[in-house]
């Protein structure tokens, strides 16, 4: 009898992991680059960068023919350094999906952030558009804590996303008078993909007690394949920064319009030339900036690609931005003497998706 119980226990222990892991997959991205960065003033150095490298687990489970459960746990991984924070939470959530669409809860990219996708030719590389769109306290390319999101089913290529971040941090905080802080955010987008066209239109708003202050923005991005080899992209964003605790100068500095155009041309089935020009028009005087970037990308196979980019960012006299600050571990701030200067960067990168 005892031997039978042991055999049953061992068999159960071996069977449970097999069942639990049946619909779970491991995925990731190793993305590194060697960069030469020059802020036009005092900083001119070669860096090795880990560019939004990640490791994740995701899975789904059919509850019944009309209802599925799904989850994802994703962490950022830093290659080339050991600074005590080599893992940082990226898109992590759990949810349900069915004919009604999908609902999920967790911490993940907002619909506004995702909406840049159609025009995102240089994501997580030198020349990333977020160097102009995600600036100062008015930034909106975020993943928010404690978020609930609903995604509609596909309707002829269209879908919509609506997300609400209930509060920042682990719980709702109180002010000095015992009142709840307004630290919630709301984001929504309308998206289309069909034939040669991919496009997104998004709106986002953050309340006054969020860590960066009250702000709202509108974003539009589109990509159109003129031929099988050539794709044209366009982008527009307007941000209004209304933080009551900020000075008039700060509100004008972070309130801005950003727009640009670009293109990708395949010179071979696995090789593409890319270029993008963007400009940031701020309300503050002498705080505008222009960025242009050119690059070539070659896919060694479906999983591995190499690339080289060159990017330049021209600053007005009251600003000191650069083309390397976003999506990368090598993101040194421009020096104090870089106001009004031209910052440039050259990068050679390797990306392996698995």
Feature locations, PLM:
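Transmembrane beta-strands of outer-membrane beta-barrel pores
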Residues: 32-38, 75-79, 109-111, 164-168, ...
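Repeated loop/turn-to-beta-strand initiation elements of outer-membrane beta-barrel proteins
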Residues: 24, 63-69, 100-104, 157-160, ...
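Residues that define the transmembrane beta-barrel architecture of outer-membrane proteins
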Residues: 43-53, 87-90, 142-146, 182-186, ...
């Amino acid at each position: 009898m005892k031997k039978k119980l042991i055999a049953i226990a061992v068999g159960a222990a071996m069977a449970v992991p097999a069942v639990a892991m049946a619909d779970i997959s491991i995925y990731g991205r190793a993305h590194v680059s060697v960069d030469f960065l020059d802020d036009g003033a005092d900083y001119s150095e070669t860096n090795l960068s880990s560019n939004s490298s990640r490791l994740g687990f995701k899975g789904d489970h059919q509850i019944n023919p009309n209802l599925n459960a799904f989850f994802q746990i994703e962490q950022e991984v830093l290659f080339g350094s050991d600074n005590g924070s080599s893992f940082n939470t990226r898109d992590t959530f759990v949810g349900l999906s069915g004919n009604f669409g999908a609902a999920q809860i967790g911490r993940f990219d907002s619909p506004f952030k995702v909406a840049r996708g159609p025009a995102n030719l240089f994501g997580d590389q030198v020349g990333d558009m977020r160097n102009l769109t995600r600036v100062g306290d008015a930034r909106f390319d975020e993943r928010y804590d404690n978020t609930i999101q609903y995604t509609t089913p596909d309707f002829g290529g269209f879908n919509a996303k609506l997300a609400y971040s209930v509060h920042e941090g682990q719980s709702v905080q109180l002010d000095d008078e015992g009142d709840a802080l307004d630290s919630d955010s709301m984001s929504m987008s309308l998206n289309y993909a069909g034939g040669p066209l991919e496009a997104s239109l998004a709106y986002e708003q953050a309340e006054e007690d969020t860590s960066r202050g009250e702000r709202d923005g509108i974003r539009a991005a589109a990509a159109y394949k003129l031929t099988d080899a050539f794709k044209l992209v366009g982008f527009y964003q307007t941000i209004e920064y209304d933080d009551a605790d900020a000075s008039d100068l700060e509100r004008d500095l972070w309130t801005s319009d950003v727009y640009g155009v670009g293109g990708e041309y395949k010179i071979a089935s696995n090789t593409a030339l890319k270029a993008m020009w963007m400009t940031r028009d701020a309300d503050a005087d002498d705080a505008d900036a222009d960025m242009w970037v050119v690059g070539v990308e070659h896919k060694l196979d479906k999983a591995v690609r190499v690339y080289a980019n060159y990017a330049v960012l021209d600053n007005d006299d009251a600003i000191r931005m650069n083309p390397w600050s976003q999506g990368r571990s090598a993101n040194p701030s421009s020096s104090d003497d870089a106001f009004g200067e031209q910052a440039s960067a050259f990068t050679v990168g390797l990306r392996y998706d698995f």
